Amino acid sequence: MPSAAYVAGLIDGDGCITAFLKRLKTSPHGFAVKGRVKITSRSLRLLEAVHRDFGGQIVDRGDGLFDLCWESFEEIERLLRTILPFLIEKREQALCMLKLCSLRRSRAFHKKVEFVRRIQELNSGASTGRGVKRA
């Protein structure tokens, strides 16, 4: 049984916490806010063990890799609240995602978009200097 600290390490190392806007004609704004937490691994056995205790959906990518994904804001919030004390590299993304989760029933679309952009900025490394080559 993987611990919350172990799962946090997987997400810090081989995972992703992201948010994005998806076109949705039925939405008043023309977009829906979506979130995703994902761990990628060659080990299906590992992801099945994490899935048993932490939920999510396993996807066979067909290239020898598997993804374990959490995509509903309820699942994402439950997962991140459990592993947050142990996250290091993706802690800021997790905190922003938790704020986004708390807004899931809000009509403040502009506020949701702010958090989507912040998460994307953190993932690009623009705010931390990661991804920038140093001499």
Task: For the regions a language model picked out, list residue spans one by one.
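Internal intein/HINT superfamily modules and their associated LAGLIDADG
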Residues: 1-135
